[in-house]
Amino acid sequence: MANQEQIIEAIKEMSVLELNDLVKAIEEEFGVTAAAPVAAAGAAGGGDAAAEKTEFDVELTSAGSSKIKVVKAVKEATGLGLKDAKELVDNAPKVIKEGVAKEEAEKLKEQLEEVGATVELK
């Protein structure tokens, strides 16, 4: 049986298509999913109703006139592939990131607005 280092070296040598097939095979074999878990906002027991919101959804409402720059910015911010980022921008309004901290949400909003996008924090 291969040790951990040998497995990692084998993975490093794989193409993106081979890695995609590997992930699918692992999902089927072990009955798991490779999707990242989405952090759900926990209910605060007896929390103050006026408490400041700590998690935000960043929604792209419009790509504006610089769609190519917006697609690149969305791709960089989300880690999506070029095709998926373009599809997300083409289908605006869409949520780009969910449940992010206020600072990160504001930073992402600023980055997207710099390239001409219209963004809302919800």
UniProtKB/Swiss-Prot annotation:
Q: Which GO terms describe its cellular component?
A: cytosolic large ribosomal subunit
Record's keyword terms, sorted: Ribonucleoprotein, Ribosomal protein
Q: One Pfam family this chain carries? A: Ribosomal_L12
Which Gene Ontology MF annotations are present?
Answer: mRNA binding; structural constituent of ribosome
Q: Which GO terms describe its biological process?
A: translation
Q: Key word Ribosomal protein present in the record?
A: yes
Keyword DNA repair appears in the UniProt entry: no
* CDD domains in the record: Ribosomal_L7_L12 (cd00387)
The role this protein plays is: Forms part of the ribosomal stalk which helps the ribosome interact with GTP-bound translation factors. Is thus essential for accurate translation.
Q: Which family does it belong to?
A: Belongs to the bacterial ribosomal protein bL12 family.
Its assembly, as annotated, is: Homodimer. Part of the ribosomal stalk of the 50S ribosomal subunit. Forms a multimeric L10(L12)X complex, where L10 forms an elongated spine to which 2 to 4 L12 dimers bind in a sequential fashion. Binds GTP-bound translation factors.
Matching entries from NCBIfam families are given as: L12 (TIGR00855)
Protein name as catalogued? Large ribosomal subunit protein bL12
- Taxonomic source organism: Staphylococcus haemolyticus (strain JCSC1435)
Q: What is the lineage of its organism?
A: Bacteria, Bacillati, Bacillota, Bacilli, Bacillales
